[in-house]
Amino acid sequence: MQVHNVNLTISAVRPEQYPDAKLPEVALAGRSNVGKSSLINTLINRRNYARTSSQPGKTQTLNFYNIEDLLYFVDVPGYGYAKVSQKEREKWARMIETYFSTRQELKGAISLVDARHEPSELDCQMIEFLHYYNIPVLVVGTKIDKIPKSKRNKSESQIRKKLQLTKNDRLILFSAVDKIGKDEVWNWIESITKVN
């Protein structure tokens, strides 16, 4: 998809703040600092539109990015950051569950994992959670440029096995640096949102 117009419409914490436009939505979820902002920036051909941060736990709201008035990317707060209080984590969990369990416009979720490491228990829980709500899932293994080509198949099978991916779940290896996987991610987004 050629992207020229992007706009951060709203940062929401409650359903009444979600956008009214009945556009399809794709959520992006993953651990803090897994590369959600880098994926968004790569997909929309911008360098720093979605703020990348060296400080984990920076995204604390559901950020709705309007893409060409055709769909929304919804950036979900990163999980697994230890310096966030238990109370704050519970608040985020409620906010995220409300969104995933009630949002009619949500067409699918991209779950990001760091391809250099085995997925964590929290990564596994996220996939289980998405399966529970019957949300189509694309798993994106990030930072693939840091893995030698000879070891990428091993990384891919490790992710599949640990996350217990079903035959309906797609897995794409991705690099924001080399743009590996960018077109495949867009193809998946277009297929589930029916936009192109």
Swiss-Prot record:
Gene this chain is encoded by: engB
The keyword Nucleotide-binding is annotated on this UniProt entry: yes
Family designation: Belongs to the TRAFAC class TrmE-Era-EngA-EngB-Septin-like GTPase superfamily. EngB GTPase family.
Superkingdom, taxonomy of origin: Bacteria
Gene Ontology cellular-component terms listed: cytosol
PANTHER family: ENGB-TYPE G DOMAIN-CONTAINING PROTEIN (PTHR11649:SF13), MSS1/TRME-RELATED GTP-BINDING PROTEIN (PTHR11649)
Positions of transmembrane segments: none
Organism: Ligilactobacillus salivarius (strain UCC118)
Function: Necessary for normal cell division and for the maintenance of normal septation.
Named cofactor requirement(s): Mg(2+)
Protein's recorded name: Probable GTP-binding protein EngB
Residue intervals of the EngB-type G domain: 22-195
Keywords tagged on the record: Cell cycle, Cell division, GTP-binding, Magnesium, Metal-binding, Nucleotide-binding, Septation
NCBIfam families: GTPase_YsxC (TIGR03598), small_GTP (TIGR00231)
Entry annotated with the keyword Cell division: yes
Gene Ontology terms, MF aspect: GTP binding; metal ion binding
An annotated GO BP: division septum assembly
Amino-acid positions noted as binding GTP in the UniProt annotation, renumbered to this chain: 30-37, 57-61, 75-78, 142-145, 174-176
Positions annotated to bind Mg(2+): 37, 59
